[in-house]
Structures are given as structure tokens and as C-alpha cells.
Design a protein with these regions (language model features):
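Conserved beta-strand in the GNAT
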Residues: 53, 60-70, 81, 86
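Conserved acetyl-CoA-binding loop-helix of GNAT-fold acetyltransferases
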Residues: 84-87, 93-106
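Conserved N-terminal entry element of GNAT/NAT acetyltransferase domains
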Residues: 1-18, 152
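Short hydrophobic/aromatic beta-strand or adjacent loop that forms the aromatic wall/cage
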Residues: 49-50, 143-149
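Active-site rim helix/loop that mediates acceptor-substrate recognition in acyltransferases
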Residues: 28-57
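Conserved active-site alpha-helix within GNAT-family acetyltransferase domains
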Residues: 110-114, 120-145
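Hydrophobic alpha-helical core bundles mediating ligand binding, dimerization, or RNAP-core interactions
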Residues: 20-28
Length: 152
């Protein structure tokens, strides 16, 4: 049976860069240029902090995440950070985000990058995938603190 989804590192299909930047922008409102700059740094091997995507059978992006130095919080010592984790609503509940998270952690570990961190307000989701709560952090422009997790 054919796999319903394809999981990939952006370096496997760099031609998706513009579509990926537009997709992440549509989900999070961060300017496309910011995504493009990070993706270019990764594709040009200026950094090993990557971008990971899930495509459906039609080649459409249905989920993704990135890894950046700092994800808009006050603990700049906790780096790098998983960012922009998103799965299209119609594709949720299928373990896609978990596979992407694992893919990123394994890839980073293979490059000697560990631990990795993420900021979220979700409780219970990331723990299922081996993430551990570390502390509360203040996210830029947010009145309430957010949860910081780590994975080794």
C-alpha cells in the first residue's frame, strides 16, 4: 500500500522553499521573508537548523515545522528551538506532528545538536513524543508565560 504522506527535510526538495515559506506565513502570520531567510541559510548550509515538511499524495504541504536559534522568548540561553509546528486540521490525529518532531530531533542529534527546545501553551501533546517540561518563559508580546519543553 502506498504511503499516504511523504515526510522530508527541505534539503530533499529545495524547490519547495517558496511554497513552504508562503504556507508557514499563512499559518503563523510571520512575514514570508523571515521564513525565506531561515530556509536559505539552511539550504546554503550556513546552519544545520532545518525545516521539515509533510506532503500529501498530491504534493501539497499538510504539516511542517522549523528549527531556529530562538523562538521569540526571553530565555535566549535555551537554543535551538522547534518553531511553527502546524498540521492542517483535516490531517490531525494521525501522528503527523509526532513524526515530524521525531524526524527533527533525530536529525539534529545526528549533527551533534542536543538538547532542542520548544515553547508552547499545549499541555500533554508534546509529552507523548518524549518532550519534558523545563520551565515557564515569557514570550515576546505575551502577557502570560508559556511552557518551555526540551528533548535530548
Amino acid at each position: 500500500m502506498e504511503e499516504e504522506y511523504r515526510f522530508l527535510d527541505l534539503r530533499e526538495m529545495p524547490e519547495l522553499k517558496n511554497a513552504a515559506a508562503a504556507w508557514f506565513h499563512a499559518k503563523w502570520g510571520v512575514p514570508e521573508e523571515a521564513y525565506l531567510a531561515c530556509m536559505d541559510s539552511y539550504l546554503n548550509r550556513e546552519t544545520e537548523l532545518g525545516w521539515y515538511l509533510c506532503l500529501d499524495r498530491d504534493g501539497c504541504i499538510v504539516a511542517g515545522l522549523g528549527v531556529i536559534e530562538h523562538d521569540f522568548h526571553d530565555r535566549k540561553d535555551l537554543s535551538p528551538n522547534i518553531c511553527a509546528v502546524y498540521t492542517e486540521p483535516a490531517c490531525r490525529g494521525r501522528g503527523i506532528a509526532g513524526r515530524l518532531l521525531n524526524m527533527a530531533v533525530v536529525d539534529l542529534r545526528s549533527k551533534g545538536v542536543t538538547p532542542v527546545y520548544l515553547v508552547t501553551n499545549h499541555i500533554g501533546f508534546y509529552e507523548r513524543y518524549g518532550w519534558k517540561f523545563l520551565c515557564m518563559v515569557r514570550s515576546d508580546g505575551e502577557p502570560e508565560p508559556s511552557r518551555m519543553y526540551f528533548h535530548r
